Amino acid sequence: MASRGVNKVILVGNVGQDPEVRYMPNGGAVANLTLATSETWRDKQTGESKEKTEWHRVVLFGKLAEITGEFVKKGSQIYIEGALQTRKWTDQAGVEKYTTEVVVNVGGTMQMLGGRQGGNDNQNNNAGSNQGWGQPQQPQPNNNQTPAQQLNQRSQGQNQPQGHGNSSQPIDFNDDIPFAGLGASFGKHTIHAIC
């Protein structure tokens, strides 16, 4: 099968602080952020609910880095697909150190999910939608339609099929994350790196 192995990391968590975006000499963007994932369990002896939070360093490159810097804020819930990499660096005292990071490059994914956006639970989650991408905007219904009815209404208003070619415009998917088969729906704000 995979004689060389597989290096794939999938994380769903909350951003710990606003992403830091900088630019390399060649003009390519790099975004750094920390992502918190938590697990909870009940202690068998005490019956207490316990929680453990793990912090992950995430580095995004290129267009994904630019979009992350623009739309992702502290508290945002995001889905990340990338690869685990360890790099060596030297601190100011001349001591060699190692850092392990999740790197999201070409072929990686960053998807904005529902939940907290910049610490404001009432803020609308349109940050990763098609705004600013040159695609026509559909009016957002303000009635009590179900998401399926809203999707059907939107798809009837689209006259042109979307292709999968080498386009700079995003493809408007409304897919759930495959492992979320327990009724969880994560929205449609997906950004893929395509070169």
Curated annotation (Swiss-Prot):
Which GO terms are recorded in the biological process aspect for this UniProt protein?
Answer: DNA replication
Q: Which InterPro entries match?
A: NA-bd_OB-fold, Primosome_PriB/ssb, ssDNA-bd
DNA-binding residues: 55-61
Q: Which residues form a coiled coil?
A: none
Please report the organism this UniProt entry assigns to the protein. Answer: Proteus vulgaris
For region Disordered, the annotated ranges are: 111-176
Q: Which CDD domains match?
A: SSB_OBF (cd04496)
Q: Which NCBIfam families match?
A: PRK09010.1 (NF006533), ssb (TIGR00621)
Keyword terms, alphabetized: DNA-binding, Plasmid
Q: PROSITE patterns, from UniProt?
A: SSB (PS50935)
SUPFAM superfamilies in UniProt:
Nucleic acid-binding proteins
Which residue range or ranges hold the SSB domain? 6-111
Gene Ontology molecular functions = single-stranded DNA binding
| Quaternary data | Homotetramer.
Could you tell me where the Low complexity compositional bias lies? Answer: 119-163
Protein name, per record: Single-stranded DNA-binding protein
Q: Does the keyword Lipoprotein apply?
A: no
One GO cellular component from the entry?
nucleoid
Pfam families given for it?
Answer: SSB
Q: Which domain of life is it from?
A: Bacteria
